[in-house]
Amino acid sequence: ADCSATGDTCDHTKKCCDDCYTCRCGTPWGANCRCDYYKARCDT
């Protein structure tokens, strides 16, 4: 799957953080994870 754009919300329908980034905000499909450029940040 293609990566979502920077800032897009990551959920179970968007694999961008798993496929092209490293996203670990509690769970692999962190509800509060957002894609960032080459990284992920947690929105708390």
UniProtKB/Swiss-Prot annotation:
Keywords: Amidation, Calcium channel impairing toxin, Disulfide bond, Ion channel impairing toxin, Knottin, Lipoprotein, Neurotoxin, Palmitate, Presynaptic neurotoxin, Secreted, Toxin, Voltage-gated calcium channel impairing toxin. It is found in: Secreted. Contains 5 disulfide bonds. Disulfide bonds join 3-17, 10-23, 16-35, 20-42, 25-33. A lipid is attached at residue 44 (O-palmitoyl threonine). GO terms for cellular component: extracellular region; host cell presynaptic membrane. The modification Threonine amide is found at residue 44. Belongs to the neurotoxin 02 (plectoxin) family. 02 (plectoxin) subfamily. Toxin that inhibits presynaptic voltage-gated calcium channel (Cav) in Drosophila nerve terminals, most likely through specific block of the Cav2 channel (known as Dmca1A). The presence of a 'disulfide through disulfide knot' structurally defines this protein as a knottin. This is Omega-plectoxin-Pt1a. It comes from Plectreurys tristis (Spider).
